[in-house]
């Protein structure tokens, strides 16, 4: 399994010989030193699946998110209408953010609250983060698109598709 592989179990400690042979870590000679930020995790899932929009600039977008069905004290809903077309798959930095109702998947991955200036982000590792990647509508849609992409582009045999999927991810 992947978790038991030598590459997965590597330390993030820098070995001088490995750094000399593989300074950019292309050959995966060491583990990552930290996990990606909240926005980058979402962007990576969309990029691998082929859904990430490369559209730059413009107003904030409202990507797909779970409906919470809550009503604010003065009649406003906490749910939003998902942006149409490719806007729903734009990079995380374009996501609309309300301090009173942050984007749930990014909040789970320690995105700043925007209440105060954040110089350094904390990084946690919680079971909730795993549940977000399994159940959040954006990640489910990205997983489905990745599966369709592997079937369409990965060849005809199961082995070819598995190898193609491994190389994509």
Residue ranges: model-predicted function:
Residues 1-4:
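Short, functionally critical alpha-helical segments immediately adjacent to catalytic or ligand/cofactor-binding
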Residues 6-164, 168:
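An acidic, gly/pro-interrupted, aromatic-rich
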